[in-house]
């Protein structure tokens, strides 16, 4: 690997340990989607002084806190990857918090029709047409992937599911701020500070962050800018 890099070439290897121990590599990205492989590779990379970008949300929700601490002790960075729903949601949350707004609920729109009892055998043809593994496709359909991504957001922010499995209402983009809010205000939540998802039209494949504030001037500006009421 080092020789290829020094010659300006692209190196391909079947041994991740070689990548983790390369003297010419500063940052590694894990996009395997396999928690076992991701955890082992990240630990090896961190032990060898590499920064780790974890595009493997399955590994991140399982052992991410440990990897983050291991990276801190080693003086390197462990981080998620921008672009996917958890990171995009975190960007909204961070922006809202920087404005002094209180987070009511944050999450994503589910991309696929929700079918809790979906099994790979039922989706082999569709998976073939979409060039996907049937098992992975079913993870998107049965809600597993959505649950995993919400755990990633919860681990990073301290926001929590309001109920096991979350509510997952069929709220449209325009209805989100009327549904995923506390019951005392006409919504479905028992408290503020939650993660959840919607299967309503106009939300997927996007993310959302519902906020509130007690500050009169901020309330006035949100209403004036037509982003709140």
Label every model-predicted segment.
Residues 125-229:
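C-terminal catalytic/substrate-binding lobe primarily of soluble NAD(P)-dependent oxidoreductases
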Residues 50, 75-76, 101, 159:
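Short glycine/serine/threonine/alanine-rich loop segments
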Residues 71-72, 79-145:
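Rossmann-like NAD(P)H-binding beta-loop-alpha module
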Residues 14, 23, 37, 62, ...:
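Conserved active-site and cofactor/substrate-binding residues in soluble primary-metabolism enzymes
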Residues 32-48, 55-84, 90, 94:
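Rossmann-fold NAD(P)-binding glycine/threonine-rich loop
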Residues 1-44, 48:
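N-terminal glycine-/serine-/threonine-rich beta1-alpha1-beta2 phosphate-ribose binding loop
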Residues 3-6, 19-22, 38, 96, ...:
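Solvent-exposed alpha-helices and their adjacent loops that cap or buttress functional pockets
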């Amino acid at each position: 690997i080092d020789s290829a890099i020094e010659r300006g070439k692209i190196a391909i290897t079947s041994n991740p340990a070689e990548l983790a121990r390369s003297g010419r590599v500063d940052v590694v990205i894990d996009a395997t989607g396999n928690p076992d492989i991701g955890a082992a590779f990240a630990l090896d990379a961190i032990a060898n002084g590499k920064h780790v970008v974890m595009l493997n949300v399955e590994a991140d929700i399982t052992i991410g806190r440990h990897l983050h601490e291991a990276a801190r002790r080693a003086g390197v960075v462990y981080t998620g990857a921008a672009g996917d729903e958890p990171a995009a949601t975190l960007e909204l949350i961070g922006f809202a918090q920087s404005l002094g707004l209180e987070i009511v609920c944050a999450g994503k729109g589910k991309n696929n029709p929700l079918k809790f009892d979906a099994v790979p055998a039922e989706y082999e043809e569709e998976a073939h047409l979409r060039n996907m593994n049937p098992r992975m496709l079913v993870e998107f359909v049965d809600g597993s992937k959505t649950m995993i991504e919400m755990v990633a957001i919860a681990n990073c922010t301290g926001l929590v599911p309001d109920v096991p499995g979350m509510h997952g209402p069929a709220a449209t983009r325009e209805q989100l701020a009327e549904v995923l809010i506390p019951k005392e205000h006409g919504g479905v939540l028992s408290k503020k500070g939650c993660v959840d998802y919607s299967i309503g039209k106009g939300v997927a494949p996007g993310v959302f962050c519902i906020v509130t504030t007690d500050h009169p001037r901020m309330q006035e500006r949100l209403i004036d800018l037509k982003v709140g009421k």
